[in-house]
A protein has these predicted regions:
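Predominantly a Rossmann-like dinucleotide-binding segment in NAD(P)-dependent oxidoreductases
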Residues: 124-215, 343
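Hydrophobic residues in well-ordered beta-strands that form the structural core
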Residues: 54, 94, 119-120, 260
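C-terminal glycine/acidic-rich active-site capping loop/insertion
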Residues: 204, 208-209, 214-215, 223, ...
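C-terminal helix-rich "cap/oligomerization" subdomain common to oxidoreductases
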Residues: 3, 23, 59, 68-71, ...
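Beta-loop-alpha module in the N-terminal Rossmann-like domain of NAD(P)-dependent dehydrogenases
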Residues: 52-110
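N-terminal Rossmann-like dinucleotide-binding module
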Residues: 1-48
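Rossmann-fold dehydrogenase core element
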Residues: 105-124, 143-148
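A short helix->loop->beta-strand "cap" motif at the edges of active sites that frequently abuts
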Residues: 50-51, 88-90, 114-117, 232-233
Length: 363
């Protein structure tokens, strides 16, 4: 089996996650890392035994010829860096958001087609509670889907004050965490038809760790309303002003519901509310009858985002979450900002197909 060589654009703390995931995979080598500040690249290379480090990413691409590049640079650089990497012959996995505007996102999508390279964007929902939930999103268990709600809210990024700078980040909580809430909804319900949104900033001054004071120029409070195929409505919330992390999705059916919990507020990662028997343990939940704690799918390093990305490279196919779905997320968030500014709902035009075997009768 051919060894896949991986390079990293960005040496901040987010890169650690991907480096560690890659170390757990067979026949994968972390070959090089780039940072604008050479000392950051050197320190990260020493920490993880990465042989080469650079402060010129084009030189890194030319000299090390990686099979794939992980892009974790500031948001406003995602498009340029990703396109340059694909042009140089590398597949790309890019942190969220895909880009800071819809035009750049479309150019990234077109570049992946032009250069015939995989463009894998985040978010990544393929965790045990989500993949297990899909097995029960069937008419047999919950009836026809009637609505849904998804949320990712927390106090706000404690690091890197550029997150609060619109010129660099492109947007605030909408782009940073709204993409997660949206991704889970569209993975279940398919493409959004229309979006309406409210977006503002509630906290005009912030105190970062170390005592640094900043004045954000981005949104920290967002509520979105979506219309999906079949007339199903869903809502999403994305904020940076909650006192704690709230990260969950609920799918409501005519005769049941699915509670998917990604935070630590609930002892149960997944609860199925249904009158049908579920493989698992019957529990009491929210004072509802007929609730089940199902057995979750197993999760290995190969099931995580790096594992799926490497699998797609080896098999020359698109990953579970392909560029089309990432582009759709970018269009929805872009037009959510437009809706919040104009007070009018916005039509969504980008298509994609859900990656799981969804029943036609469910929606």
């Amino acid at each position: 089996m051919k060894k896949i060589k991986i390079a990293y654009l960005g040496a901040g703390e987010i890169s650690d996650r991907f480096i560690i995931m890659a170390q757990k995979l067979k026949n994968v080598e972390n070959i090089a890392i780039y940072s604008k500040h050479i000392e950051n690249a050197r320190n990260k290379a020493l920490k993880y035994n990465i042989p080469f480090y650079y402060n010129n990413y084009k030189k890194m691409l030319k000299e090390t010829k990686p099979d794939a590049v992980i892009v974790t640079t500031p948001h406003s650089l995602h498009a340029k860096h990703s396109i340059d990497c694909m042009k140089a012959g590398a597949h790309v996995l890019v942190e969220k958001p895909l880009a800071t505007n819809f035009k750049d996102a479309k150019n990234m999508y077109l570049a992946s087609k032009k250069y015939k390279k995989i463009l894998n964007g985040l978010p990544f929902d393929h965790y045990p509670q989500f993949t297990t939930a899909l097995k029960y999103i069937k008419e047999k268990y919950i009836g026809k889907i009637t609505s849904a709600h998804s949320e990712l809210s927390f106090p706000g990024p404690p690091r890197l004050n550029w997150y609060y700078d619109k010129k660099i980040a492109g947007g605030g909580a909408m782009l940073d965490v709204g993409c997660y809430a949206l991704s889970r909804l569209i993975s279940v319900l398919g493409p959004v038809k229309y979006v309406s949104a409210f977006s503002n900033m509630l906290i005009p001054k912030r105190l970062l760790p170390g005592g640094k004071k900043i004045k954000p120029t981005v949104d920290d409070n967002n509520v979105l309303l979506f219309e999906f195929e079949g007339g199903v409505f869903a809502t999403a919330k994305a904020s940076w002003q909650h006192p704690f992390l709230e990260n969950r999705t609920v799918i409501y059916g005519r005769c049941g519901a699915i509670f998917i919990n990604f935070d630590n507020l609930d002892e149960y990662p997944l609860v199925i509310h249904t009158k049908k028997k579920v493989q698992g343990k019957k529990i009491k939940y929210r004072n509802l009858p007929d609730c089940w704690l199902p057995e979750l799918d197993k999760f290995t390093p190969e099931d995580d985002i790096m594992g799926k990305f490497i699998y797609a490279i080896r098999n020359n196919n698109q990953p579970v979450y392909d560029a089309g779905q990432s582009l759709h997320i970018m269009e929805v968030m872009h037009k959510a900002y437009v809706s919040a500014k104009t007070g009018k709902k916005q039509k969504i035009t980008t298509p994609f197909r859900v990656w799981w075997n969804k029943e036609k009768e469910i929606q």
